[in-house]
Amino acid sequence: MVILEFLQTLLRNNPEIALFLAIAIGYWIGKFRFGSLQIGGVAGSLLAAVLISQIGIHIDSGLKTVLFALFIYAVGFQSGPQFFKSLGRQSLREVLMAFVLAISGLFTVLAVARMFHLDKGLAAGVAAGGLTQSAIIGTASSALEKLGLPLAQTQMLQGHVAVGYAVTYIFGSLAPIIICVNILPWLMKRGLREDALTAEAEQMQGMAVYGDGERPALSEFVSRVYQVKKAGQSVQQIESDHVTVEQIRRQKNLVAVTQDSTVEAGDLLLLFGHRADVISTGELLGEEIKQPPHDMDVVIVRHDVLLTNKAFVGKSVAECSQILSQVARHGVYFLGLKRGDKTLPLTSDLHILSGDIVTLYGTRQDVDRVAKELGSLLTRSLKTDLVFHGVGLVVGLLIGLIVVRLGSIPLTLGSGGGALLSGLLFGWYQNRHSKSGNMPMAASTLLVDFGLSGFVAVTGLQTGQQAVTTIMQQGITLFMLGVVVSIVPLIITMLFGRYVLQYKNTAVFAGALAGSRSANPALGEILNKAGNAVPTTSFAITYAIANVLLTLLGPLVVAFS
């Protein structure tokens, strides 16, 4: 008993401890599986926060704004390049997704309000919580003031908006996680991670980018050691078959490798290059050594180079190859070229532009030598450019302050929408100007994970006590109506996207579905399962549209319920 009183006092006086405790317990809960269902750390944090909130904790709402801004800015920054590339007629499906969910959400709310005789305040609250669109509280409350009702009745209805929101918000946050992360992959019969890799490979024009710890089973470049059977060939002759002789071992000693070096019978040669070229050249040289000496190994690096040398600008790849002598190119392989947000295959007639990023592959000394000829190495710094990203967040929050009025209805992106838009813009800019705005993937991942889990934990700590109390007072009916409002529009939109819009990629589809519900917690779990930022592009499009459409539901529910 003394321990419980101590914990209550501790958490009430130190809400920051309650916040981190909710996150820790939530991610622990999120690890458990119930059949094929795993709620994940974000939903777990929300449940843990609701449980902790029962002791009565006050936590500042400003913290929730900051955490969500960090989360959504990082999401926008990761997906900015692909987002702007996707805008156009090809994004029509995402627009339709957002409209279908908003319309089906409106009719679902009106149906349950009529069937169960909810007043306008409770109906609007169920819409706000069940659809997890907090802005509906504001627009519905403003609409209630325009009805000309007595002040006491207006205030009562506005209070009912908050009650309906508090009761239904928690499951409203869980529903899109369950549907997007568990039910949608079951419907599509494909996993999020597999389709995320497929979509990324298509965006990269066949050049797949693998997640941490993932590598292709069939590597494009290989190293093999062969024992020479017949003497007489020079290194230059061997390398004419598009391979590189990296090491020569004669008897028990390594010898210097030059273009004029002549190999002798019994020499061990370390060949490096494309798999097919190495195998075909090696078979002509002699027998492959299955267990080569350790001193023959070399370290291979892969680096991006920002092309700034004017001697290469405007030239084709073939012309650039001629400018770079064979000696300068020795041992270096060009993997690809990135221009803005597009990855281009290195064909002989492709013309080079200033600012292109070329990916080189070879030994460190060879890559460094060629990089000096082309421009400058783009080193992967572990430092985050906080000047760049601090300005980005300021710009986003300022955008969120802008209010446009549609009649009596105030429309605003809010801090979250503003930070998302700013993240998209700054991510796009950084992609085109790689020297500034660096943010390591680990740093942006931390912002996404901590920002989102912290946001939902603060929400749970703020509304959890009221939600449980209201359920006790109002009964389970209101909660179940929220379940219906949360699930039915998502199911309708999911089926519409699958069978009418013909979505084929599970990761892209999941992002679009989560965005059409403005379901930020669901996005976090989708990104966790996908392992890359592919779902964010479709999410960003539907989220921006849904943020406006769902906000407009407040006055419509008040008018027609």
Swiss-Prot record:
Subcellular localization, as worded in the UniProt entry: Cell membrane
Molecular function terms, GO-annotated: monoatomic cation transmembrane transporter activity
Main location group: membrane
One Gene Ontology cellular component annotation held by this UniProt entry: plasma membrane
Transmembrane parts of this sequence: 10-29, 34-56, 63-80, 95-117, 122-144, 164-186, 386-403, 407-429, 442-464, 479-501, 538-560
Matching InterPro entries: AAE_transporter (IPR050144), Asp_Ala_antiprt (IPR022457), RCK_C (IPR006037), RCK_C_sf (IPR036721), YidE_YbjL (IPR006512)
Entry keyword set: Cell membrane, Membrane, Repeat, Transmembrane, Transmembrane helix, Transport
Gene Ontology annotations of biological process type: potassium ion transport
Membrane disposition: Multi-pass membrane protein
Domain RCK C-terminal per the UniProt entry, residue ranges: 205-287, 294-376
Protein family per UniProt: Belongs to the AAE transporter (TC 2.A.81) family.
Protein's recorded name: Uncharacterized transporter ZMO1681
Organism phylogeny: Bacteria, Pseudomonadati, Pseudomonadota, Alphaproteobacteria, Sphingomonadales
